[in-house]
């Protein structure tokens, strides 16, 4: 699943590389009515393995993925892979997620582990990512090394857990919330190394508002965890 908003410079390359990387995967582009024509370009690439889901407006990362989960679940898919549309996640590494899928409900593509690599990212973004994961790990009592990674695989069973949960995040905090749900339902989680490359075209969707939402929600979950442990 590839959520998009104004990614016309990147989406064709991501789709073509994904199709070349694995014959096992189908591709779903979830477009939030991109004004730059991303959705129309994705439509032109539709075939038996490539699909496009159009949403009426920009609603955030979380709602876009939920729409994609619903689409895939209704069609009987067993595994769901999240991937950014900007080329930062390498389609050629999807095999690492797929290989780890048997016996696991959540496979986290991790930048900050042996074998992982981050290229062309400014120090500010590195610090935000590392601090965010560290803070969330302490607040939630988790030991994973990249809670905010957007390159991950989810099982159908975890998707069912997500559907029955009261999700409260819209932005990148959604990725932390998914790990929280998986842990709460005692789902089996594993990490695999990935290469992350800073986008070369288009604009990042990261904003101060998104960072604040993730921080506020993580802090709230941390307080709730402390209260429930008493």
What positions do the PLM features span?
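Acidic helix N-cap motif at the loop->helix transition within catalytic regions
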Residues: 9-13, 36-45
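Short, well-formed alpha-helical segments that are part of the catalytic scaffolds
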Residues: 6-20
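Short, hydrophobic/glycine-enriched beta-strand segments
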Residues: 1-3
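Catalytic donor-sugar/metal-binding loop of nucleotide-sugar-dependent glycosyltransferases
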Residues: 143, 166-170, 179-196
């Amino acid at each position: 699943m590839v959520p998009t908003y104004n990614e016309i410079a990147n989406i064709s390359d991501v789709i073509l590389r994904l199709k070349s990387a694995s014959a096992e995967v189908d591709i779903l582009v979830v477009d939030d009515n991109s004004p730059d024509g991303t959705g129309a370009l994705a439509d032109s690439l539709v075939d038996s393995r490539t699909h496009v889901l159009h949403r009426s407006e920009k609603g955030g990362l979380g709602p876009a993925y939920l729409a994609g989960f619903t689409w895939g679940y209704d069609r009987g898919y067993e595994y769901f892979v999240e991937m950014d549309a900007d080329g930062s996640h390498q389609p050629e590494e999807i095999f690492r997620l797929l290989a780890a899928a048997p016996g696991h409900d959540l496979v986290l593509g991790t930048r900050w582990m042996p074998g992982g690599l981050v290229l062309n990212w400014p120090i500010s973004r590195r610090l935000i990512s590392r601090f965010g994961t560290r803070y969330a790990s302490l607040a939630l009592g988790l030991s994973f090394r990249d809670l905010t990674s957007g390159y991950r695989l989810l099982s159908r069973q975890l998707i069912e857990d997500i559907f029955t949960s009261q999700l409260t995040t819209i932005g990148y905090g959604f990725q932390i919330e998914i790990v929280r749900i998986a842990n709460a339902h005692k789902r089996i989680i594993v990490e695999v190394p990935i290469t992350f490359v800073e986008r070369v075209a288009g604009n990042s969707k990261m904003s101060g508002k998104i960072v604040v939402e993730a921080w506020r929600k993580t802090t709230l979950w941390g307080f709730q965890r402390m209260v429930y442990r008493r």
